[in-house]
């Protein structure tokens, strides 16, 4: 990390922290994070947002920084992490496609179908179908 970057971070911290020990501790933790400069700036910005909204407990913040649980791993991002995990799971195990389980109105039995949960958990799954002969699509 170059000197200009260190000075910029120190200025940002001095603006929001009054205790010199906290500034020093916060700066030392930040400059030793192995995730790079972008992550460090995200941490500082997240801290400033927490400080401005009066949600900041400095001890909690130090613990999160030390364990690198700030920014994306922070509890304020739980819903986004859940969506990201669902997308990752879909990419790791894509939908299974069945052939011949449904008959098309054109008479062909070469229909590809798959099930997907599109409504709430207590509703049944939706079945999407595509006829390979007439290219007709429908949802059951």
Swiss-Prot record:
Q: Which UniProt keywords apply?
A: Metal-binding, Zinc, Zinc-finger
Supply the InterPro entries for this chain: Znf_TFIIS
Can you provide one Gene Ontology molecular function annotated for this UniProt record?
Answer: zinc ion binding
- Provide the binding site for Zn(2+): 104, 106, 131, 134
Query: What is this protein identified as?
Result: Putative transcription elongation factor S-II-like protein 349L
The highest taxon in the source lineage is Viruses
Q: Which family does it belong to?
A: Belongs to the IIV-6 349L family.
Alphabetical GO biological process terms: DNA-templated transcription
């Amino acid at each position: 990390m170059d000197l200009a970057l260190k000075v910029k971070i120190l200025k940002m911290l001095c603006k929001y922290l009054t205790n010199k020990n906290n500034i020093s501790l916060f700066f030392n933790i930040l400059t030793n994070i192995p995730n790079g400069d972008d992550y460090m700036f995200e941490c500082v910005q997240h801290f400033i947002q927490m400080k401005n909204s009066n949600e900041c407990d400095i001890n909690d913040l130090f613990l999160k920084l030390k364990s690198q649980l700030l920014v994306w791993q922070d509890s304020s991002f739980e819903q986004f992490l859940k969506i990201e995990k669902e997308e990752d799971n879909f990419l790791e195990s894509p939908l299974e496609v069945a052939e011949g389980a449904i008959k098309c109105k054109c008479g062909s039995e070469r229909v590809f179908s798959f099930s997907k949960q599109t409504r709430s958990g207590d509703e049944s799954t939706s079945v999407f179908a595509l006829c390979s002969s007439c290219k007709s699509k429908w949802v059951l």
